[in-house]
Amino acid sequence: MRRIKLTIAYDGTNYRGWQIQQPTAAHPEGSVPTIQGALQRALGQLLPKEAVHGAAADTATAPDQVHEAVAPGVLPVVGASRTDSGVHALGNVACFDTESTIPAANFPKAINRYLPADIRVMQADEVSMDFHPRFVSHEKCYEYRIDHGRVANPLTRLYAYHYTYPLDLERIRAAARELVGVHDFTSFVNPDSQVFEHGGDAVREIYSIDILEEGTQLVIRIRGNGFLYHMIRIIVGTLLIIGNGRRAPEDIRTMLAAKDRTTAGPTVPAHGLCLCALNYDAAVTAEDVRDDGDTETLAQDAETV
């Protein structure tokens, strides 16, 4: 048995997030498009002898040996970051187990034959059987793009949030500095986050927040050891209201201390967010890494659209 690690890029516009949705009466199995679902179907077509079929789907296990929702004719995969509905990625990571002898370097071309044009496997590597994309050491890097032009650029409308209010970038940078480090980010997490239901906490570490200008776009790049449900989008919404003068940069300290979602800013739309990269550098220790803690249901996804 071999374990294959995939680096995946996708345009999330037409998908209800990464994770396969549990079927409901309104949305029967297979009717809700997800990145994981498309990838599992593609692998099932590429490796039909290893695909899960019929009753076997009820007992299928993914590489972490934990049951994942699968449909007949698919090969289960586990992803590193379970992105929300409408969120994009340049470097998400997933892995699957296989007995195939296909060289790892040949998997991208082979899998991409069965994927829609808005999802692509960019790279494949064979890894050790104890590699887990979600729990081994890594950091996540996200970017949120804001179109700050007077008129929205039609070519970036699916990838940047058009925001026309005046912004003071020095105020935004001052506020961002207050967020760097280890904090309890409860005020910056959607209260529906399942991490709270499972007895977890909102303590995470943000390594850096960079505020960049690219023409009429403002790019907010955030690196950290893990992010919770809507956390980045709430952080960006908070930085924007500080940037246009409705709150002060030092109010970040009060928000963090309050541990109350109502004290922070709004949740900005999903389409401006992109998962840029996952770093599996050994310099980041396993203790530093925090899982995002959330599975995404249709009800949760509906709030992000």
Where are the regions that the model predicts?
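Structured-RNA-binding interfaces characteristic of tRNA pseudouridine synthases
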Residues: 1-305
